[in-house]
């Protein structure tokens, strides 16, 4: 599989280059040249496959010959070595629990896969790589854990002051060794802007050999497809119809991976982009006017993004045709008051719920 730069289609690279380089010229994101479909029999009979085999089948065409098959199987096995259960809330709603990983964030999967790929690619390289990443909360901890103490790799994490939770800040700042956390007096969008600025500086790139661990990196973005397949495997045990998939959305890498999996053959009736008060995409879907804004601080801080980087990939998946996009995706914006009200209602009205206490 080769990847082209969405801002310069003549820039074409392989998976290894895309993973190490992070993004292309002029801050362009890389995108796969082809969308290889899942075998129908595979999708219809996921229960016959182990989770590791499902993950391997999901990723093998994107990695191609850059990682040997057995090494890739080992990478995906280590990446998904924790429970990813689909819990039934009521007759109409099930929720995929993605908080059982080492940093309690759904990004443990993407960050875990990427860190292992980079470790493999860089094992014989003399020059140290610097992973530069902006975080709104979850990404930083997952990346820090995934890359912690890996030889030949330094990690620099930019996070917005007073906009991550105390637990998230400890995950960023407490590890030490090759993990460096920098507090930025601004929003996540400011952090992301600094990262993009660094990547566009040729001298900085050459000196530090920069790569990114945000979902702009294909090695972080693409493996998120895996848990959509694992959710479908469990869904098929009790349901015959295709699900409507609702995804909490900030930088839009997660839902973009789900849509990619769908276009490859994963059944989905519709997608819902669930946003907090940062409503750029819901407004776009209503008005056809894409107008990035300065991110607003909310209780769901990991979703505080006013200019979602991955939306350009979603548009590419739909050939930049608004009507095709709107037919498959709806967007909703929920404020803090409604967020708290819904949490309270779920706890009060749902029999099956759990409180996880981390000592």
Stretches with model-predicted labels:
Residues 1-359:
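PLP-dependent amino-acid enzyme catalytic core
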């Amino acid at each position: 599989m080769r990847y082209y730069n969405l801002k310069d289609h003549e820039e074409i690279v392989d998976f290894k280059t895309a993973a190490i380089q992070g993004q292309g010229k002029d801050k362009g994101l890389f995108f796969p040249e082809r969308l290889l479909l899942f075998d129908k029999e595979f999708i219809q009979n996921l229960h016959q496959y182990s989770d590791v085999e499902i993950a391997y089948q999901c990723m093998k065409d994107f990695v191609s010959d850059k990682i040997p098959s057995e090494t890739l199987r080992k990478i995906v096995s280590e990446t998904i070595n924790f429970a990813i259960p689909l819990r039934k809330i009521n007759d109409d709603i099930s929720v995929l629990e993605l908080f059982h990983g080492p940093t309690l964030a759904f990004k443990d999967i993407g960050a875990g896969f990427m860190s292992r790929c980079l470790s493999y690619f860089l094992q014989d390289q003399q020059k140290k790589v610097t992973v530069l990443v902006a975080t709104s909360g979850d990404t930083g901890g997952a990346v820090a854990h995934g890359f912690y103490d890996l030889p030949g790799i330094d990690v620099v994490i930019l996070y917005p002051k007073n906009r991550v939770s105390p637990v998230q800040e400890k995950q960023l700042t407490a590890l030490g060794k090759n993990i460096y956390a920098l507090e930025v007096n601004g929003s996540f969008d400011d952090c992301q802007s600094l990262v993009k600025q660094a990547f566009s500086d040729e001298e900085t790139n050459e000196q530090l050999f920069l790569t990114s661990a945000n979902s702009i990196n294909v090695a972080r973005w693409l493996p998120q497809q895996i848990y959509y397949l694992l959710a479908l495997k469990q869904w098929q045990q009790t349901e015959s119809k295709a699900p409507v998939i609702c995804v909490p959305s900030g930088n839009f890498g997660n839902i973009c991976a789900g849509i990619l999996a769908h276009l490859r053959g994963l059944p989905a009736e519709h997608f819902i982009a669930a946003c907090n008060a940062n409503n750029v995409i819901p407004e776009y879907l209503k008005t056809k006017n894409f107008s990035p804004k300065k991110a607003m601080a909310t209780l769901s801080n990991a979703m505080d993004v006013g200019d979602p980087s991955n939306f350009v990939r979603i548009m590419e998946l739909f050939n930049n045709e608004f009507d095709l996009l709107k037919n498959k995706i709806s967007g909703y914006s929920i404020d803090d008051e409604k967020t708290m009200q819904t949490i309270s209602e779920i706890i009060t009205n749902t029999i099956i719920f759990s409180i996880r206490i981390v000592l």
